[in-house]
Amino acid sequence: MVKKTSGRGQRDLKVKVKTARGRKLSSTRWLERQLNDPYVAAARRDGYRGRAAYKIIDLDDKYRFLVPGARVVDLGCAPGGWCQVAVKRVNALGEKSGKAVGRIIGLDLQEMEPIAGCELHQLDFMEDDADLKVKDWLGGRADVVMSDMAASASGHKQTDHMRIMALCEAAAELAFDVLEPGGTFVAKVLAGGAEGTLQRLLKQRFKKVANVKPGASRADSSEKFVVATGFRGRDEA
């Protein structure tokens, strides 16, 4: 659990960063936010590669899809925080005696530093045979497909929204091809008006679809996460 200070204590502990010569004001504000972010501090303390780890922790605490023995695919997995959480929760290293041992496959366009208990592949998940490769690596179908992907920011909110929704829809299509019936799909979206297509698509394929803003998401961010559970299977939709 990440603890936040409040009231006078929070104001007294806040770090201020002076704007150095050559540093933009926006960069200074970003640095200040990082230095004062309890999730950034917690990630360093807990050994996670980024604050995003606490988003999947929040989501899994509520929906319980990362269970021991689960087979998980993490799309756009760099820098690896979600994979690190999944390794622990699905018992990928077999550290929980008497519990089933899960498997984690992480896919990303960029090469990554290894993560114990996770099989990383440098792959574009939009390739035509990506689903076949994933099922081959897993030795079967996945129980969970998850994505914290976001396209590179353009500075234009609607453009960024459309890009991330296109990524989400592509991720959902891969999930339809690799998920076991009863499986779960989790993906980040940005609010902006074009979520309807994805929602309709998921409601056809899953028994339940929820939209959640984890506590670890920044208050000023338009991001939220779609959690679709109870995959019906392609042929049953």
UniProtKB/Swiss-Prot annotation:
Organism: Jannaschia sp. (strain CCS1)
EC id: 2.1.1.166
One Pfam family this sequence matches: FtsJ
Cellular component terms (Gene Ontology): cytoplasm
Domain of life assignment: Bacteria
Family recorded in the similarity comment: Belongs to the class I-like SAM-binding methyltransferase superfamily. RNA methyltransferase RlmE family.
Protein name per Swiss-Prot or TrEMBL: Ribosomal RNA large subunit methyltransferase E
Upper classification of the organism: Bacteria, Pseudomonadati, Pseudomonadota, Alphaproteobacteria, Rhodobacterales
Active site (UniProt): K188
